[in-house]
Design a protein with these regions (language model features):
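Short beta-strand scaffold segments in enzyme catalytic cores
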Residues: 44, 91-93, 227-231
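Hydrophobic alpha-helical segments and helix pairs
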Residues: 112-150, 155
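Conserved phosphate/ATP/ADP-binding segment of small-molecule kinases
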Residues: 146-234
Length: 310
């Protein structure tokens, strides 16, 4: 079974606009709300793809009913520590004409230290039942910045593989505990590891150096419309998605993580891990709002994903 951790869950409000004008009038074509947060997105995708998943994080008392209803509607098993406050709401303005998304995200309610420690204890109580755990996304105020390092250490003690999808100090501190795989996007990777430039060759070279340093076993970097790469320091693969109509970009990176997790659960090799990830992301790009890929789309797209060795 795969587990996910979402310490800063939210409601995503996705507004579709045809031609965004800064400082001008913008009319919304479509508007939807989804329970979200990076780990929850991974869970939703895994659930749709047929992989058993255990979701965990904080439960904000002021938004308890709407959040639990969203989890129930999506058949997610959620282990949580309840805290005061309300779910943050993130506004995603997607311009379908330019295919550019502008995000306006709230920070999330403050979480006191005793609740953080309570979650670490909760996590330690169930992580040993998992094969893989995904740690992803931002953290709210009050949560220690080395939280992912602490959780990865607890998972490593139980022999559980960790996938880390964070940015900045959350990513770098998490690396100190040697997760199995990290999955930054292009911007996060360049910001944290400073390759010479943003070319595929330089990103792949820097990713291999990170693995060879012993910080992690694998590195995957998502590169937007270009696709994604995966390396174990020896072999490196690049996968490009098929042509398709993009309806929204939210959750695509989380779907890559879900696809990789599914391939790991099925015992697949690196090329298929990447193929699964890009196929899942492609399926999500076809959905509106923060809606994850459908299994039928994933299965149809899977043989269309081109994977090559670099």
């Amino acid at each position: 079974m795969t587990g996910t951790v979402t310490l800063n869950p939210c409601i995503d409000r996705t507004c579709c606009i045809d031609g965004f004008t800064v400082g001008g009038m913008n009319r919304i074509i479509s508007d939807r709300r989804d329970i979200s947060g990076k780990g929850i997105n991974v869970s939703l995708a895994l659930k749709e793809l047929g992989e058993p998943v255990l979701t965990s994080g904080f439960l904000y008392s002021g938004s308890r009913s709407v959040f639990l209803e969203g989890l129930k509607n999506n058949f997610l098993d959620y282990r949580a520590v309840e805290v005061d406050g309300y779910l943050r709401e993130n506004i995603k303005l997607w311009d379908k004409r330019s295919d550019i998304t502008t995000e306006v995200n709230q920070k999330g309610a403050f979480v006191p230290e005793d609740k953080v420690e309570a979650f670490i204890s909760l996590f330690s109580s169930f992580v040993g039942t998992l094969d893989t755990v995904v740690l992803s996304g931002s953290v709210p105020e009050g949560v220690r910045r080395d939280i992912y390092r602490v959780l990865i250490e607890r998972a490593n003690e139980k022999g559980v593989k960790c996938i880390l999808d964070g940015e900045g100090d959350l990513l770098l501190s998490g690396l100190e505990a040697r997760p199995f795989l990290i999955k930054p996007n292009e911007y996060e990777f360049i910001s944290a590891f400073a390759p010479k430039d943003g070319s595929l060759e330089e990103i792949a070279k820097r990713a291999k150096e990170i693995v060879r340093s012993g910080m992690t076993t694998m590195v995957s970097v998502t590169l937007g419309r270009r696709g994604a790469l995966l390396t174990d320091g020896k072999d490196t693969y690049f996968a490009s998605p098929p042509e398709m109509e993009v309806k929204c970009t939210q959750g695509a990176g989380d779907s890559v993580v879900a696809g990789i997790s599914l391939a790991m659960a099925e015992g697949k090799g690196m090329a298929d891990m990447l193929r699964y990830g890009v196929a899942a992301a492609s399926g999500t790009l076809m959905r509106e709002g923060t809606e994850m890929c459908r299994k039928e789309d994933f299965m149809r797209i899977l043989p269309q994903v081109k994977v090559k060795s670099l």
